[in-house]
Amino acid sequence: PDFTEDMLYGKYLPNESGALYYREGFITQLMPTKDKNYLVIDNFNRIDPDIFQTYINVLEGYEVTLPRYNKDGSMIKWSKNKDSFYHFNPNWHIIGVTYDSIEDIKQKYSQQFLKYTRIVRVNHSE
């Protein structure tokens, strides 16, 4: 796959001494900022829509627990709640660049997800 959940939401990796640290994913790194931000994904049509389920759950108002811990040992939460470690930023959007038709993309991805995603269709060069 072109994108994995680890790439979008982050994962634990060993450092040089063998201790684990959490490397942010594209979404978790950009989402908490207060400014308008974009994540541009080329060949968007090649991404399995299931890997966006965590993001969609937050968009739909659910609180999601990520496999990451705060300094106090509690699991990190992501929600629309302003006190959440990762707070949903309504000024943040995914831009998907695709060769597929917009109709194909609408069939593949949920309406809630597409509300926060901008799709740009490019033509194949002959």
Residue ranges, per PLM feature:
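AAA+ P-loop NTPase catalytic core and its hallmark functional loops
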Residues: 1-126
